[in-house]
């Protein structure tokens, strides 16, 4: 309990300070000439070019963001597992995965859903999104990179879950459908997302189900990655819906835990995407004795949030939109040491003041350093959302 109290104090002491980031000072309009962007790739890494800094300027991001090091695409800077998610609606993510495949140990295309069709009957959908040519390209670029599609328990009713929880035969059929699909499609395993669907209820029943799935996948020599919510609920001092007890129970049968240490703030409570003290607390609460740390994949976000002072609104933004904001408004980027994130402010003509939190090379590097210090891997949501030169850091 002493550890929990200490972690809660640290998070509470640092995170609320940034919630009032929309200052009264309007952004001043700079000269009309748009900043330039490099189109050529670089011979050196962003680390060598001095770009990983708290003192970063908008014009430098605009100039350099596409210029990753083409000569070191297979050079890794993270020794632990690195998982990258790819979604069908973001084609650039597919290209990024192919280009930087060697920097990832695991790539998870968000393709699949498992549906319950009746008693002991399961059907996996989304197979129309599977791109075997792309998988072949990934494996050609990096023989060690494993393809582990995410599978979502889609359209399940509470009664569906109850039926599975109460029947070993149901669990066996469900796990069997997953194993067969992996064999048919030549997948290396699955990322399973189900825990949050029951809102923290039926924890022991979920542990039982996932234990059986894990054992079936391991028997078939397939990887099992489980998506888990943060151990400390964002913006509160409450423990999350997946805690140390469940972690200890599942760690022996789960190969990796994809920990969602992002989405800390919201339009109703604008602020940082993943304050560093909160990220650290989420890991230490799950595994205070570092027994299974290498199985935790610290979640990194490659998207940002644009908050408006009008009506407590906000929306996610991707790299292209972020660059547009930098070009149009030429804002000053501010570094907050307590949360280890950059943010900026700008003003629309009739839209009021905005604050933008978007990852930078420095904020990503700080989290990579934390992962190394704590002995974890990382998972990235999602490839293609951020800026191309981010991948030099991996």
Curated annotation (Swiss-Prot):
UniProt keywords, alphabetically: Lysosome, Secreted, Signal
PANTHER family for this protein: CHITINASE DOMAIN-CONTAINING PROTEIN 1 (PTHR46066:SF2), CHITINASE DOMAIN-CONTAINING PROTEIN 1 FAMILY MEMBER (PTHR46066)
Domain GH18: residue ranges: 80-394
Database matches in CDD domains: GH18_SI-CLP (cd02876)
InterPro entries: Chitinase_II/V-like_cat, Chitinase_insertion_sf, Glyco_hydro18_cat, Glycoside_hydrolase_SF
Signal peptide extent: 1-20
Gene from which the chain derives: chid1
Single GO MF descriptor: chitin binding
Subcellular location: Secreted; Lysosome
Protein name as it appears in the record: Chitinase domain-containing protein 1
One annotated Gene Ontology cellular component of this protein: extracellular region
Species in which this protein is naturally found: Xenopus tropicalis
Predominant location: secreted
One GO term (biological process): carbohydrate metabolic process
Family statement: Belongs to the glycosyl hydrolase 18 family.
Domain of life: Eukaryota
């Amino acid at each position: 309990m002493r550890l929990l109290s200490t972690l809660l104090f640290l998070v509470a002491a640092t995170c609320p300070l940034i919630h009032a980031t929309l200052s009264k000072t309007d952004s001043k309009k700079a000269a009309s000439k748009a900043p330039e962007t490099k189109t050529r790739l670089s011979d050196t890494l962003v680390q060598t070019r001095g770009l990983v800094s708290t003192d970063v300027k908008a014009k430098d991001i605009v100039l350099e963001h596409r210029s990753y090091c083409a000569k070191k695409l297979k050079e890794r800077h993270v020794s632990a597992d690195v998982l990258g998610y790819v979604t069908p609606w973001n084609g650039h993510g597919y290209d990024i995965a192919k280009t930087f495949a060697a920097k990832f140990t695991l790539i998870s295309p968000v393709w699949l859903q498992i549906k319950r069709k009746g008693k002991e009957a399961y059907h996996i959908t989304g197979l129309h999104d599977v791109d075997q040519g792309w998988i072949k390209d990934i494996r050609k670029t990096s023989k060690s990179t494993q393809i582990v599609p995410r599978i979502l328990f889609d359209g399940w009713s509470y009664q569906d879950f109850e039926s599975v929880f109460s029947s070993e035969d149901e669990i066996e059929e469900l796990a069997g459908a997953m194993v067969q699909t992996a064999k048919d499609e030549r997948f290396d395993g699955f990322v399973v997302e189900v825990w949050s669907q029951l809102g923290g209820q039926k924890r022991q029943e979920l542990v039982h189900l996932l234990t059986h799935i894990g054992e079936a996948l391991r028997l078939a020599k397939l990887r099992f990655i489980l998506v888990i919510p943060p151990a400390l609920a964002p913006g509160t001092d409450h423990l999350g819906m997946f805690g140390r007890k469940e972690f200890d129970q599942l760690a022996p049968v789960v190969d990796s835990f994809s920990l969602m240490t992002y989405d800390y703030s919201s339009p109703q409570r604008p602020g940082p995407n993943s304050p560093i003290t909160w990220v650290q607390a989420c890991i230490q609460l799950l595994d205070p004795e570092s027994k299974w740390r290498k199985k935790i994949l610290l979640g990194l976000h490659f998207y940002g949030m644009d908050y408006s002072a009008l009506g407590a609104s906000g929306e996610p933004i991707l790299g292209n939109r972020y660059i547009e904001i930098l070009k149009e408004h030429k804002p000053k980027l501010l570094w907050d040491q307590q949360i280890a994130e950059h943010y900026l402010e700008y003003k629309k003509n009739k839209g009021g003041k905005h604050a933008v939190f978007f990852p930078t090379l420095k904020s990503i590097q700080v989290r990579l350093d934390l992962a190394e210090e704590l002995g974890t891997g990382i998972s990235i949501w999602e490839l293609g959302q951020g800026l191309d030169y981010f991948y030099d850091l991996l």
